[in-house]
């Protein structure tokens, strides 16, 4: 494990123990060699009535280009909250290239909860996340995200069989494990 190189692609939240601020210390303590690529600087979690998101798309583009030029390798990539359509395309293309080389790709398609997309997340994100899932070894959508990705209606309750069918539908998008 000490030589396992993990690239975490997610937002950095100023107020709240989520995303990179939660992942970095835990995975570092576990002995992984952690590298991070912040997709945004976020003032607080999106469930508050007011927040600010600082877009880092250009930073992401430049960093990935430099890292590829320098030959940096990763054993696994984990994606989380991605802010813009352009950033999603850049990260998806990078993950597809790396997956072809054997890098494991973990996708948390963070885009909504409680039956709707998060504030500021456009509908077009759904299609872009579907493309990212095509190269995913592991996908961890919540119920809302799984329904949005598979064009299924969001229900108050589902049966175990409906839950399994939803997982299978996400798997049909390309994710090897859900």
Predicted features by range, described:
Residues 2-107, 111-119:
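Conserved N-terminal subdomain of the carbohydrate kinase-like
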Residues 120-178:
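Conserved phosphate/ATP/ADP-binding segment of small-molecule kinases
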């Amino acid at each position: 494990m000490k030589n396992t190189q993990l690239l975490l692609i997610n937002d950095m939240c100023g107020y709240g123990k989520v995303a990179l601020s939660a992942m970095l210390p835990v995975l570092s303590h576990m002995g992984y060699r952690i590298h991070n690529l912040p997709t945004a600087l976020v003032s607080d979690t999106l469930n508050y009535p007011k927040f600010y998101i600082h877009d880092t798309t250009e930073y992401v583009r430049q960093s990935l280009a430099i890292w590829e030029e320098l030959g940096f390798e990763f054993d696994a990539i984990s994606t989380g909250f991605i802010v813009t359509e352009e950033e999603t395309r850049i990260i998806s293309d990078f993950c597809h290239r790396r997956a072809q080389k054997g890098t494991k790709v973990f996708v948390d398609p963070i885009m909504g909860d409680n039956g709707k997309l998060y504030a500021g997340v456009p509908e077009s994100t759904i299609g872009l996340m579907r493309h990212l899932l095509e190269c995913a070894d592991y996908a961890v959508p919540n119920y809302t995200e799984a329904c949005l990705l598979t064009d299924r209606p969001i229900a108050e309750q589902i049966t175990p069989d409906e839950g399994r069918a939803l997982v299978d539908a996400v798997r049909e998008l390309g994710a090897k494990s859900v």
